[in-house]
Amino acid sequence: FERPLPKSLFNGKAVLMGDAAHPMVPFLGQGGCLAIEDAYCLSSLIKKIKDLDQMVNVYDQMRNKRGRWIQKRSRLQGLFNHVSNPVLTPVRNIITKISMRSSVTKIHSYDLNEELSLKINSQL
């Protein structure tokens, strides 16, 4: 299941997190991880930025960018996983091995605390 991502994670009344903010196919196993990151990010921003509009704007910038990138990678991984043509399967295996290594490295080397510090300091 996949649906388009919202343009913004804040509609004036509610802040979206987790699957509501960035629904994706499960081929990278990141849906729950993003929900935890979202909650941590939002709670950290609430503590540090008192202006609501400014706080949700920073949250939206941070989480929308990462969510979109992971959603795109997960979709591509799903396409590669389902290639069944015997001629293309060896090529798929090589591409998947390379792309997965790159994606997993980028996903797991992300430092939310570092990004929060940079964003919060630039807002104050």
Regions found by a protein language model. Name each.
Residues F1-F80:
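Conserved mid-domain beta->alpha element of the FAD-binding
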Residues N93-L124:
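C-terminal auxiliary extensions adjacent to catalytic cores
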Residues V87-T89:
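Long, charge-rich low-complexity segments
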